[in-house]
């Protein structure tokens, strides 16, 4: 009953309120699929039939590969998988108090995450390394994650460049024939204010 209420509320948001989509190609894709699109406002409203048709195309289950096959993560059929939070900006220590995260902090959290058996994934950005320019962070994070953990990896899909770089690195690790196309998307501001 609670799941159904959540589903219905989600459908109402997608149909009645809609989402901001700030990419022309994304607007094209949704419009071609039959969604209501306002290009001037960069806004899309998704009919529940369209949403459910897309959801029906998703596989019922899949395996998220890890560098160590013993750490592959099965997704689906009521399997539970835990991942760490991502995008944390600050670290706190007894010695230095609260401060912006660094690449060294990221490496330390990655090592800690690797040792936690109850966490199945290595997070995409366990801590934001503020000592690295934002445009380069993914290029510093992912190689370190590949080197410091053999768990299944996640990387941010914040735009085409980051996603393409992550897929390229994944193919170097898993082989050219791999299809590393899984990403968790979240939108903290679906109605962004102007």
Task: Cite the ranges covered by each PLM segment.
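Acidic/polar, glycine-rich intrinsically disordered N-terminal extensions of enzymes
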Residues: 1-105
């Amino acid at each position: 009953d609670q799941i159904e209420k959540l589903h219905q509320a989600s459908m109402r948001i997608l149909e009645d309120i809609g989402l901001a989509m700030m990419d022309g190609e994304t607007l094209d894709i949704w419009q071609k699929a039959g969604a209501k699109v306002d290009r001037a406002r960069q806004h899309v409203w998704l009919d529940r039939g369209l949403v459910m048709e897309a959801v029906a195309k998703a596989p019922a289950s899949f395996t998220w590969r890890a560098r160590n096959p013993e750490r592959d993560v099965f997704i689906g059929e009521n399997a539970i998988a835990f991942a760490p939070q991502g995008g944390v900006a600050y670290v706190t220590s007894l010695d230095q108090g609260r401060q912006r995260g660094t690449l060294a902090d990221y490496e330390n959290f990655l090592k800690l995450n690797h040792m936690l058996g109850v966490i199945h994934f290595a997070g995409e950005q366990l801590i934001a390394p503020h000592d690295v320019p934002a445009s380069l962070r993914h290029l510093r994070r992912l190689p370190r994650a590949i080197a410091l953990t053999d768990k299944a990896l996640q990387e941010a899909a914040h735009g085409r460049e980051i996603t393409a770089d992550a897929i390229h690195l994944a193919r170097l690790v898993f082989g050219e024939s791999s299809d590393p196309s899984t990403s968790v998307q979240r939108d903290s501001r679906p109605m962004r204010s102007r």
